[in-house]
């Protein structure tokens, strides 16, 4: 699990000796004692993300570490919520100003331009006290993302936003868990925690969720059609 400290728009999630896997900025597999969630302004467009992160952490009283996973979000940290279940805890910041829709009857659009998306608005940090191998830790990212998509579809009608990110962590010294799928204690606990934390974060916000991509401040609809063929 992790211990939390919140100051000046930065949430520290401390888990000494943890192994992390991040899909966010400067992500990948790392060993670190903590991870961070940083709220950025709406007009955020730094020349150097690394310098920005370093400065924000220092200004908030935290010691910047290059090995620490960092998530960036437009959601204020006052809306962060943490859920615990069994061997898992999940921290979530959730907002839907930039929904990403995936219609099942696409009308044949085009691929979007490659450009900077708004900072992630549904971010998750999932940590377990179990020790996971490479495969189980990687699979936990998929489990968390699946639970996030199911929760958002049921709550808001969208599976995600244009810039969501997931960080997962395990305790290398904990009890070994060979698998992390949805039918395992780790996977099931993660799914429950994601559901509760995401809904609680959304419920903490005064702003209503958009009912369509068109009514959102930002967003995208994947209406391009892919070609299907037999191998």
Curated annotation (Swiss-Prot):
EC number: 3.5.1.90
InterPro entries associated with the record: AdoCbi_amidolase, CbiZ
Parts forming coiled coils: none
Keywords for the protein's UniProt record, in alphabetical order: Hydrolase
Domain of life: Archaea
Signal peptide coordinates: none
GO MF annotations in UniProt: adenosylcobinamide hydrolase activity
PANTHER family for this protein: ADENOSYLCOBINAMIDE AMIDOHYDROLASE
Purpose: Converts adenosylcobinamide (AdoCbi) to adenosylcobyric acid (AdoCby), an intermediate of the de novo coenzyme B12 biosynthetic route.
Protein name in the entry: Adenosylcobinamide amidohydrolase
Gene name of the encoded protein: cbiZ
């Amino acid at each position: 699990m992790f211990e939390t400290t919140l100051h000046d728009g930065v949430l520290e999630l401390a888990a000494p000796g943890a192994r992390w896997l991040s899909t966010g900025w400067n992500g990948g597999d790392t060993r670190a004692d903590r991870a961070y969630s940083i709220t950025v302004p709406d007009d955020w467009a730094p020349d150097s993300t690394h310098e920005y992160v370093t400065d924000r952490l220092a200004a908030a009283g935290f010691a910047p570490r290059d090995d620490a996973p960092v998530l960036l979000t437009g959601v204020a940290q006052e809306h962060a919520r943490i859920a615990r279940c069994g061997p898992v805890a999940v921290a979530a910041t959730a907002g839907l100003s930039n929904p990403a829709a995936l219609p099942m009857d696409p009308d044949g659009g085009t691929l979007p331009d490659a450009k900077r998306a708004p900072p992630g608005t549904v971010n998750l940090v999932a940590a377990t006290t179990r020790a996971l191998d490479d495969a189980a830790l990687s699979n936990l990212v998929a489990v968390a993302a699946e639970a996030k998509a199911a929760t958002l579809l049921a709550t808001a009608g969208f599976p995600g936003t244009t810039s969501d990110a997931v960080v997962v962590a395990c305790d290398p010294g904990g009890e070994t868990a060979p698998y992390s799928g949805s039918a395992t204690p780790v996977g099931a606990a993660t799914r429950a925690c994601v559901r509760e934390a995401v809904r609680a974060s959304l419920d903490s916000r005064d702003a209503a969720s958009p009912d369509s991509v068109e009514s959102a401040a930002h967003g995208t609809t994947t209406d391009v059609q892919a070609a299907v063929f037999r191998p």
